[in-house]
């Protein structure tokens, strides 16, 4: 029998061994190879001593998975899941089990990355294309994005687009109807202030009284009224203004489309298409506009192109609009969006089909009609005389009604003027309606739902005017009409999944992206109703579980970052950057330094940095990097001194985007502070800091954290993400506030950057679990193994490829850059060829041509075992051998396995393959490891130029299905 203690047998650190890829023996092998005695020795060799923490993190010890689940179950049980009739953009919905089990809970969908490598992402690209088709069909417009972060930020993007394309060039007013959701108005005002736009909020009909570049209307509006604004929109067009409409996606199934009324932009939340409320998110916003505005559209667009065999293939289209290319000139700073949730919404539409959606929408409307009939029968006055799912009621005893509602376990919308709102949803049942009668009318009301239903059938309903009833067909494409059985739906989802490479197949070593394990135990709580079915505007005493989770998580993040306060509102890394820069901007303004508007940004920075600075109303001054990849201190000092009077901040990433710990980071902070500026430290590379150092300890003032990188939230194929920010004490009063939910903080009345007060709160249990399970020791060791894995890969590959940058002791941080430019010059083989060839080896390519063109940036993360690292290294070494054959003239530059990659089954079945100078086995089974676990790309290399010149962003023609 064992002599181990009971504590040892309880295995409180078992999850640490599950999360970290290489076991102790593998770690020691790698340490021996790189020339370090231990993880501590390696850490001392890599991290500058001046910034190395000399304390443990105050996040507690690690715990077992069952123990962690028990902890968070107790927290979840503190949430009271009331039936919600609050509405305001968030509704109850039924998540089809076939979608929950096969998409939301499936690592084949949630661990994939943004489809920059489209040849190995055709499945989710098709699902996103379906989302775009749903968006276009329902809104009546031509071109949709693949998702935005939420309805409110989408509305802010609509404002920005309107300004870009409006021909009313001298106009500076954006009009917002006063019946738009308050959280949307809040976010618009925040964004407008940075742009210098004037926002006018007033009755919809007053929009024509202003010289404006754009206007926003809600359809149906906040009180539930369905307004036909066709004539108003025409008048606004005469003034050269653009018209945007925030629309309810479910209502559009049965209502006249905003596009047919003349809207130029239609946006909204797709949440009620099968995505839980999640206390505010994550949800995918849809954004649709006219084809003529395609180059001004924010966010990703999925388009149809063709591959080298002429077959239809999907890709991200018109990327030259985006931040990673256009930087401060980009349409938006949007990067990660909400692809996983967009996929869920698109599958919801596919599963139900147009007829199923119509039945759901009509049932919601019928139940609303029944409630309205009961109220009017008792002489109760309604604010609105048309409706889809929302009634606004006046004249009732608010106190009595609210007391009955809470006692019954349901939430109503209570307006400040005494109006009571009731918004019904897909989850509302006949018995719920009877319960509503009792709550709204009290005892003895005598109303019967069945009798009222019969009367409505006999007499008809006028709550949707005939001219506003949708008469055109929607979702006629075969995709939306053939998968209504669960068997077919399950197989369709599986067919798409099989086309994609995700973490459940192999390592995704994308530099600056941190594709680590998203453990099943961490993911489990997000599907619990206690987290998923909470409305973000519910009474705070019902959300005590969320309150505890958010408080504990904030406390942990404060300790990990070395800051004094945290805001959890930003729902992406880009939004976190924006929120952090806003805090800096408002801090300067509070000191009478509003003129401080210059942001210094190193030339190596990620494109979101300048895009976010521009969004915050700042001017960008670029600082140089030296030959070693570090910030050029002489240039930095000169430029900081030159702009000292107007210096707002610097945005710097640490470790640098070149993959090294810069020794001068402390001096950089000092220089900026000496000239009155603030230091924004981008948290993209936080996976190399946790437990070893921290932004606050280094000397920074504010950072955002990518919870979808460092803290285990999955990338979801392009979202969801979370970008909370940490700040020093002096910036805390300038964190984001919220117009609907107050928490008694100094920052409550500040503008919002997201629709919900805690952004995508529904996925925060993942990060809570990650920190709880790993504890202080596990978090630190995870960082150390990330460094070990990166240095192991770097040293192994350095014998075959030049490594571009190293830091002290010729070490890298958590990622390394290999320089392909000399090979390209010698052989003609490009970085694109190598990236696509890796697909044949079963790998997603590392980050290509960032931060330096002609390079690959590799970040293996701590979750990858030595076995997987060696398989990747073997692939890269094998590819180097293939390049050598091209260099030697054995293979032509334009006809070799790299140039023709990736290879498909169609390639090797083609008799014409015999004319190639390499064998079929060399093409698709280049190593024995590939034979054991082959991933087959389903298309050949895609023609990007063709796709942009022949832009098509909707489902394939029906003829393709015949």
From Swiss-Prot:
SUPFAM superfamilies xrefs: PLP-dependent transferases
GO BP: glycine decarboxylation via glycine cleavage system
Keyword Oxidoreductase: yes
EC number(s) given by UniProt: 1.4.4.2
Catalyzed reactions: N(6)-[(R)-lipoyl]-L-lysyl-[glycine-cleavage complex H protein] + glycine + H(+) = N(6)-[(R)-S(8)-aminomethyldihydrolipoyl]-L-lysyl-[glycine-cleavage complex H protein] + CO2
Modified residues (N6-(pyridoxal phosphate)lysine): 709
Cellular component GO terms held in the UniProt record: cytosol; glycine cleavage complex
Listed CDD domains: GDC-P
Cofactor: pyridoxal 5'-phosphate
Family stated for the protein in its record: Belongs to the GcvP family.
Cited function: The glycine cleavage system catalyzes the degradation of glycine. The P protein binds the alpha-amino group of glycine through its pyridoxal phosphate cofactor; CO(2) is released and the remaining methylamine moiety is then transferred to the lipoamide cofactor of the H protein.
Stored PANTHER family: GLYCINE DEHYDROGENASE (DECARBOXYLATING) (PTHR11773:SF13), GLYCINE DEHYDROGENASE, DECARBOXYLATING (PTHR11773)
Subunit description: The glycine cleavage system is composed of four proteins: P, T, L and H.
Protein name: Glycine dehydrogenase (decarboxylating)
Lineage summary: Bacteria, Pseudomonadati, Pseudomonadota, Gammaproteobacteria, Alteromonadales
Name of the gene: gcvP
């Amino acid at each position: 029998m064992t002599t181990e203690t009971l504590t040892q047998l309880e295995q409180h650190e078992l999850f640490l061994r599950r999360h970290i890829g290489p076991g102790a023996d593998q770690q020691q092998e790698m340490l021996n190879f790189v020339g370090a005695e231990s993880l501590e020795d390696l850490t001392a060799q890599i991290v500058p001593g001046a910034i190395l923490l000399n304390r443990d993190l105050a996040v507690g010890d690690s715990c077992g998975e069952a123990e962690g689940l028990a902890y968070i179950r107790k927290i979840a049980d503190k949430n009271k899941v009331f039936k919600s009739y609050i509405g305001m953009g968030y509704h109850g919905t039924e998540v089809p089990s076939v979608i929950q089990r096969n998409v939301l809970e499936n690592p084949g969908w949630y661990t994939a990355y943004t489809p920059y490598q489209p040849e190995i992402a055709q499945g989710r690209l098709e699902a996103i294309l379906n989302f775009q088709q749903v968006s276009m069909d329902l809104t009546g417009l031509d071109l949709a994005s693949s998702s935005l972060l939420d309805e409110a930020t989408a509305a802010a993007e609509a404002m920005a687009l309107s300004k870009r394309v409006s021909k009313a060039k001298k106009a500076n007013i954006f009009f917002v109807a006063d019946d738009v959701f308050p959280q949307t108005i809040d976010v618009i005002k925040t964004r407008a202030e940075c742009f210098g736009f004037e926002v006018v909020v007033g009755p919809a009909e007053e929009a024509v009284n202003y010289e404006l570049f754009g206007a926003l209307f809600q359809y149906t509006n906040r009180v539930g009224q369905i307004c036909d604004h066709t004539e108003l929109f025409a008048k606004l067009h005469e003034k050269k203004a653009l018209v945007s409409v925030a629309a309810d996606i479910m209502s559009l199934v049965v209502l006249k489309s905003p596009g047919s009324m003349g809207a130029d932009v239609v946006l909204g939340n797709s949440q009620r298409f099968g995505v839980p409320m999640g206390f505010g998110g994550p949800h995918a916003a849809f954004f649709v506009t006219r084809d003529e505005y395609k180059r001004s559209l924010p966010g990703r667009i999925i388009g149809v192109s063709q591959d080298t065999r002429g077959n239809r293939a999907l890709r991200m289209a018109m990327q030259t609009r985006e931040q990673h290319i256009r930087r401060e000139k980009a349409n938006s700073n949007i990067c990660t969006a909400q692809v996983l949730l967009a996929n869920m919404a698109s599958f919801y539409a596919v599963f139900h089909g147009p007829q199923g959606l119509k039945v759901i929408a009509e049932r919601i409307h019928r139940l609303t009609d029944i409630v309205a009939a009961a109220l009017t029968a008792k002489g109760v006055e309604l604010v609105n005389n048309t409706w889809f799912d929302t009634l606004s009621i006046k004249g009732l005893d608010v106190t009595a009604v609210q007391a009955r509602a809470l006692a019954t376990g349901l939430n109503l919308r209570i307006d400040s003027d005494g109006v009571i709102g009731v918004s019904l949803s897909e989850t509302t049942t006949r018995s719920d309606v009877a319960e509503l009668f009792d709550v709204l009318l009290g005892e003895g009301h005598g109303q019967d739902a069945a009798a009222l239903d019969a009367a409505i059938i006999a007499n008809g309903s006028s709550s949707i005017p005939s001219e506003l009833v949708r008469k055109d067909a929607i979702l006629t494409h075969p995709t939306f009409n053939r998968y209504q059985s669960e068997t077919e739906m399950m197989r369709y989802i599986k067919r798409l999944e099989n086309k994609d490479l995700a973490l459940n197949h192999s390592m995704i070593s994308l530099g600056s992206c941190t594709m680590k394990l998203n453990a099943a135990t961490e993911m489990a709580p997000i599907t619990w109703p206690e987290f998923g079915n909470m409305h973000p505007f519910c009474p705070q005493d019902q959300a005590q579980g969320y309150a505890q989770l958010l408080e504990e998580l904030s406390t942990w993040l404060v300790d990990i970052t070395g800051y004094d306060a945290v805001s959890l509102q930003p729902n992406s890394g880009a939004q976190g950057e924006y929120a952090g820069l806003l805090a800096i901007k408002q801090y300067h303004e509070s000191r009478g330094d509003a003129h401080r508007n210059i942001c210094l940004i190193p030339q190596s920075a990620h494109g979101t940095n300048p895009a976010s600075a521009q969004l915050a109303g700042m001017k960008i001054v670029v600082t140089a990097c030296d030959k070693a990849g570090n910030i050029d201190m002489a240039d930095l000092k000169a430029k900081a001194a030159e702009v000292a009077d107007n210096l707002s901040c610097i945005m710097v990433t640490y470790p640098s985007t070149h993959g090294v710990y810069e020794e001068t980071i402390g001096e950089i902070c000092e220089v900026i502070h000496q000239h009155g500026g603030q230091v924004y430290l981008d948290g993209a590379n936080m996976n190399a800091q946790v437990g070893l150092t921290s932004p606050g300890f280094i000397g920074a003032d504010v950072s955002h954290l990518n919870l979808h990188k460092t803290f285990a939230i999955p990338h979801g194929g392009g979202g969801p993400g979370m970008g909370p920010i940490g700040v020093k004490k002096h910036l805390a009063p300038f964190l984001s506030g919220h117009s609907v939910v107050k928490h008694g903080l100094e920052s409550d009345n500040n503008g919002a950057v997201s629709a919900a007060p805690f952004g995508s709160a529904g996925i925060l249990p993942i990060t809570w679990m990650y920190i709880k399970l790993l504890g202080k020791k596990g978090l630190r060791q995870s960082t150390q193994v990330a460094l070990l894995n990166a240095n192991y890969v770097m040293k192994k590959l350095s014998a075959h490829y030049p490594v571009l940058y190293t830091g002290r002791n010729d070490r890298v941080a958590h990622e390394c850059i290999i320089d392909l430019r000399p090979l390209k010059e010698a052989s003609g083989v490009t970085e694109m060829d190598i990236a696509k060839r890796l697909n044949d080896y079963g790998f997603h390519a590392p980050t290509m041509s960032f931060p330096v063109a002609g390079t690959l940036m590799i970040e293996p993360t701590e979750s990858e075992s030595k076995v997987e690292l060696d398989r990747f290294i073997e692939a890269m070494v094998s590819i180097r051998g293939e390049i050598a054959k091209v260099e030697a003239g054995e293979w032509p530059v334009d006809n070799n396995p790299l140039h023709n990659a990736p290879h498909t089954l169609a390639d090797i079945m083609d008799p014409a393959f015999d004319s190639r100078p390499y064998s079929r086995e060399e093409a698709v089974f280049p190593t024995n490891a590939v034979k054991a676990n082959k991933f087959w790309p389903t298309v050949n290399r895609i023609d990007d130029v063709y796709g942009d010149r022949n832009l098509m962003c909707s489902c394939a023609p029906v003829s393709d299905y015949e």
